[in-house]
Amino acid sequence: GDFNCWNQTDHPLTHIGDGVWELYLEGENALWDGCKVKTVVDSNLIRTEHIPLYIRRAVQDSRTNIFCGEVVDERSTFRWTDANFVATDDIFIYEAHIGMCLEEGRIASYREFADQILPHIKDSGYTTIQLMAIMEHPYYGSFGYQVSNFYAASSRFGTPDDLKYLVNKAHEMGLAVLLDLVHSHAVKNTADGINLFDGTT
C-alpha cells in the first residue's frame, strides 16, 4: 500500500492459525486515514491482489476504475445527536436507493439523500427507511446485490461520516434505518471481492 510504496514483498503477513493472518506495523502513524492498501495472496494457483476482507472503506480509482482498500481513522470526530431516538412499533417502510434518489440523472450522495429526500419520506408518513446498495459493490447496475466488501459502505455515495450523517438525521426525524444486505450475492471478482482470497474458489 501507500505505507510501503506498494512493495508486494516488504511486509509479509504471519499465519497464526484457523485461516487468520496478521501484520504488525510499528509506529502510531504507520497507517493513516486515507492510506490505500491491498493484500497480495500467493497461492498454489496464482498470485492475486485483493482488498483486505475487513476493510471499512473501498474507493475506486477514477483513471483505472480499480477498487482499493482505504484506511479509515476510527477516531472519527462525527458527533451523534440521536441519543433520544426510539423506533416505533408501527413500522411503515420506505425502500430507497441512495444513488437513484435525485431527478438530475446523476449519482446522489448520502448527504443529499438526508437533506432532500428524508423530509419527503417523513412527511409521507413513513416510519422506517430501508436503504439498498449500502455495502461496497463494484458494479453499480447490480443495485448493490453483488457485494465486494461487506464491512465497507459504498464510497460512490460519500464517506463513512456522510452515512453517519444520514442515519443521525433520520433518527432525529423519528425514522428507523434498515440496511438491505444480501450475503448470498457476493461478487465473483477476485481483485475487489472475496473470491480466491484464501487461494481457493
Listing of model-derived features with the role each one plays in the protein:
Residues 1-3:
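Extended low-complexity, serine/threonine- and proline-enriched intrinsically disordered segments
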Residues 5-95, 100-105:
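The feature marks proteins involved in alpha-glucan
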Residues 59, 81-88, 97-201:
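Substrate-binding/active-site clefts of carbohydrate-active enzymes
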